[in-house]
Amino acid sequence: MFTGSIVALVTPMDDKGNVCRSSLKKLIDYHVASGTSAIVSVGTTGESATLSHDEHGDVVMMTLELADGRIPVIAGTGANATAEAISLTQRFNDSGVVGCLTVTPYYNRPTQEGLYQHFKAIAEHTDLPQILYNVPSRTGCDMLPETVGRLAKVKNIVAIKEATGNLSRVHQIKELVSDDFLLLSGDDATGLDFMQLGGHGVISVTANVAARDMAEMCRLAAEGQFAEARVINQRLMPLHNKLFVEPNPIPVKWACKELGLVATDTLRLPMTPITDNGKEIVRAALKHAGLL
C-alpha cells in the first residue's frame, strides 16, 4: 500500500469554500478505477494549512467513508509543534487509515536532533505506520539522510516521502536504512528516475489528473520496464512541471475542474485562483499528456 502511485489528493470545495462531498466521492471513484495505490488525505495538496483542525479530521474521515475499503487512505498529520502533531495523529488511531504522512516542522526550523526527537515522539504515541516527509522548499528545514537513518530504526517509522528532487538522496538514504524501509519520491518530475535508483513509488500531484498513467508508469518501473515507463513519463513531463507554474495546489485544482473531476476550483485565502496565463500553460500541458 506504500508503493506505486499514491495520490496527494486535492480537497474539493464548493463555491462557498466548504468541503464538497460529491466531488470528493467522484475523485475517490476515479482513483479506485484508475489503479492508484493509495490516497493521501489532507496533505499539502489537500490544503491542510487552510483547514481547521476539526475540518482536517472530518475530511480524512469522510475520505475513509467514501473510499469504503476500496483504496487505502493515508492521513496527513504534520504540524510544527510536536504536541499538536501527536494529537492530530492520535485522532486517527483505530480510524481505518493505514498510516500517517508527517511533514518536517515548518517555519521554526529545528536542528537535526530536534527533527529526530519530534518524529520519534510522534511514533511513540501511536501504532500507526509513519511516513516521514521532507520538503525543504516549503518548510525551510531539510532532514538529512543521517537523521532519516536514525529514525528508520523506530519500529513504526516505515517510509519517507523525499521531495528535495535531489536524486543522490536515494543512495544516501538506502545506505543507512534496512531493505524494508520504503523510499517514495515527492517530486513528480524526478519520480521515475527516483524509482530507477531504487525508490518504491511516488506520492504524486500529477496523479490527481493523470491517475491511470501514473499508476501504469509506476507499475512498469517496479517491474524494471523503464523504457516503457519513460514513454509515459515523457508525455507527462510538461504536466509534472507546469502543475507548479503557480503555487501548489492552485494549478492542479484548476486542472481537476477543467477535466470535470471536481465541481469548482475554489481555494481558501491566502491561496488565490489561477491566473489566465497559468490556465493556458496548464491547458497546454494537459493536451500534451493526452488528457484534453
Swiss-Prot record:
<comment type="function">
    <text>Catalyzes the condensation of (S)-aspartate-beta-semialdehyde [(S)-ASA] and pyruvate to 4-hydroxy-tetrahydrodipicolinate (HTPA).</text>
</comment>
<feature type="binding site">
    <location>
        <position position="45"/>
    </location>
    <ligand>
        <name>pyruvate</name>
    </ligand>
</feature>
<dbReference type="InterPro" id="IPR005263">
    <property type="entry name" value="DapA"/>
</dbReference>
<dbReference type="GO" id="GO:0005829">
    <property type="term" value="C:cytosol"/>
</dbReference>
<comment type="subunit">
    <text>Homotetramer; dimer of dimers.</text>
</comment>
<feature type="site" description="Part of a proton relay during catalysis">
    <location>
        <position position="44"/>
    </location>
</feature>
<dbReference type="InterPro" id="IPR020625">
    <property type="entry name" value="Schiff_base-form_aldolases_AS"/>
</dbReference>
<feature type="site" description="Part of a proton relay during catalysis">
    <location>
        <position position="107"/>
    </location>
</feature>
<keyword id="KW-0457">Lysine biosynthesis</keyword>
<dbReference type="InterPro" id="IPR013785">
    <property type="entry name" value="Aldolase_TIM"/>
</dbReference>
<comment type="pathway">
    <text>Amino-acid biosynthesis; L-lysine biosynthesis via DAP pathway; (S)-tetrahydrodipicolinate from L-aspartate: step 3/4.</text>
</comment>
<feature type="binding site">
    <location>
        <position position="203"/>
    </location>
    <ligand>
        <name>pyruvate</name>
    </ligand>
</feature>
<dbReference type="GO" id="GO:0019877">
    <property type="term" value="P:diaminopimelate biosynthetic process"/>
</dbReference>
<keyword id="KW-0028">Amino-acid biosynthesis</keyword>
<keyword id="KW-0963">Cytoplasm</keyword>
<dbReference type="Pfam" id="PF00701">
    <property type="entry name" value="DHDPS"/>
</dbReference>
<comment type="similarity">
    <text>Belongs to the DapA family.</text>
</comment>
<keyword id="KW-0456">Lyase</keyword>
<keyword id="KW-0220">Diaminopimelate biosynthesis</keyword>
<dbReference type="GO" id="GO:0009089">
    <property type="term" value="P:lysine biosynthetic process via diaminopimelate"/>
</dbReference>
<keyword id="KW-0704">Schiff base</keyword>
<dbReference type="InterPro" id="IPR002220">
    <property type="entry name" value="DapA-like"/>
</dbReference>
<feature type="active site" description="Proton donor/acceptor">
    <location>
        <position position="133"/>
    </location>
</feature>
<protein>
    <recommendedName>
        <fullName>4-hydroxy-tetrahydrodipicolinate synthase</fullName>
        <ecNumber>4.3.3.7</ecNumber>
    </recommendedName>
</protein>
<feature type="active site" description="Schiff-base intermediate with substrate">
    <location>
        <position position="161"/>
    </location>
</feature>
<dbReference type="InterPro" id="IPR020624">
    <property type="entry name" value="Schiff_base-form_aldolases_CS"/>
</dbReference>
<dbReference type="GO" id="GO:0008840">
    <property type="term" value="F:4-hydroxy-tetrahydrodipicolinate synthase activity"/>
</dbReference>
